[in-house]
């Protein structure tokens, strides 16, 4: 399995590389915000079209709420699986996208998005990672894991 993980965490799998906090511009075809089941399946669909994907997620691992909140809970509405747990679903999706070599940026949150002069998008994370892509997919899931407090004095 060849997954490349960029993270602000010290828990890295496979290739130990870090970009967080370094001022570099990564270029790819698609940036997917969210590495839950929808984000992972998006990698598969885009991979079939030979598109390179980078995923941004605030969590330190793929799977979103399925893996983080209820990894052992049975899920009954996934096609071709009468019953599957949240972690099993995540594991199957990771296995399915392996041939497309997605790049994960864990422990980072999308902070800004702007259009460049050449018409592509530049996404910057809260840790300063910048990724230039033709397309941005928002697969942020059912809710944020980081509470946003209102600016009350």
Which residues make up each language-model segment?
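FAD-binding core/adjacent interface of flavoenzyme oxidoreductases
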Residues: 3-6, 14-16, 21-31, 48-49, ...
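N-terminal Rossmann-like FAD-binding beta1-loop-alpha1 element of flavoenzymes
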Residues: 28-54
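Gly/Ser/Thr-rich beta-alpha loop segments that engage phosphate groups in nucleotides
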Residues: 36-41, 65-66, 143-145
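Glycine-rich FAD pyrophosphate-binding loop
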Residues: 48-67
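Generic structural signal for well-ordered secondary structure
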Residues: 59, 71, 90, 138-139
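N-terminal Rossmann-like dinucleotide/flavin-binding domain of flavoprotein oxidoreductases
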Residues: 67-130
């Amino acid at each position: 399995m060849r997954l490349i993980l960029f993270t602000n965490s010290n828990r890295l799998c496979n290739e130990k590389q870090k970009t967080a906090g370094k001022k570099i511009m990564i270029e790819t075809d698609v940036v997917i915000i969210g590495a839950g089941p929808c984000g992972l399946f998006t990698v598969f669909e885009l991979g079939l079209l030979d598109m390179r994907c980078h995923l941004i997620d605030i969590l330190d691992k793929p799977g979103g709420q399925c893996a983080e909140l209820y990894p052992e809970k049975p899920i009954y509405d996934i096609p071709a699986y009468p019953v599957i747990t949240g972690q099993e679903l995540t594991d199957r999706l990771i296995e399915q996208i392996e041939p497309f070599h997605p790049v994960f940026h864990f422990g980072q949150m999308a902070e800004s998005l702007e259009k460049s002069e050449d018409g592509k998008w530049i996404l910057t994370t809260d840790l300063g990672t910048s990724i230039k892509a033709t397309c941005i997919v928002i697969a942020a899931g059912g809710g944020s894991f980081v509470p946003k407090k209102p600016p009350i004095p």
